[in-house]
Amino acid sequence: MKKWMMATAVVSLMALSACNNGDSEAVVETKNGAITKDEFYNEMKERVGKTVLRDLIDEKVLSKKYKVTDEEIDREIERIKEAYGTQYDLAVQQNGEKVIREMIKLDLLRAKAAIEDIKVTDKELKEYYDNYKPKVRASHILVEDEKTAKEVKAKLDKGEDFAKLAKEYSQDPGSASNGGDLGWFGAGKMVKEFEEAAYKLKVGEVSDPIKTDYGYHIIKVTDKEKKKTFDKMKEEITFEVKRSKLDPSTMQSKVDKLVKDANVKIKDKDLQDVLEQQ
């Protein structure tokens, strides 16, 4: 996530570099003087120029051989959202979705290059598929004690509205105001007792009170993804299994080799050591 916080600077530098020819046009004017495009560009280059240039070189070299689809970027975004939650949302607010998607695309290009020579067996792929659980979408009502949980469940059994009761009773500040909606989640994202109960429910079905360390939950599954066939998931599974075997040093060395083979020539004397810095 940290590198995404540089994304605004990256985009600004790229835009300014296109028009930087000793440009004295002001980007900011004050009563104490102006800040020119040239001054702004040079300062940006000094602060983040080498990082930006390395990213641009990697993208240019890798995109010639490897392709990343919008669907792959979407899947990666979902994975990142599950792992980082509000940090991802903050990155999008600060930098814009387009910039974040470009950063993710570059990460996937690097990963595809690095995993190219990693071997996986059919057994490993089948095992991953068998253990894979599609995402579910659920709502819940969280209360502190079993007595209250049973009272709420009785109201639900009589046909009262789940979302309305969630707003009235639920002690989960993150979902109560949304009628208890937790959104989509996959395996391993909830505590064990909650997850097991949610995955057993059919769409529209409501659980009995489930006890966890947080209290008592009443769960309603509102939607479920359908599990694709192995053949339809094979490419995605192969990538994930290979990536699980990858270490950062392997990725860096593979990308470095491809960049070296591309015979990159850096003409800006201030940035000529970019490829020597890791």
From Swiss-Prot:
Membrane topology: Lipid-anchor
GO cellular component, one term: plasma membrane
Keywords associated with the record: Cell membrane, Isomerase, Lipoprotein, Membrane, Palmitate, Rotamase, Signal
Gene encoding the protein: prsA
Protein name: Foldase protein PrsA
Chief location of this protein within or outside the cell: membrane
Keyword rRNA-binding applies: no
One Pfam family cited in the UniProt record for this chain: Rotamase_3
Residue ranges the record marks as coiled coil: none
Domain PpiC: 133-223
Entry's family note: Belongs to the PrsA family.
Species in which this protein is naturally found: Geobacillus thermodenitrificans (strain NG80-2)
Enzyme Commission code(s) on record: 5.2.1.8
Signal sequence segment: 1-18
SUPFAM superfamilies given in the database record: FKBP-like, Triger factor/SurA peptide-binding domain-like
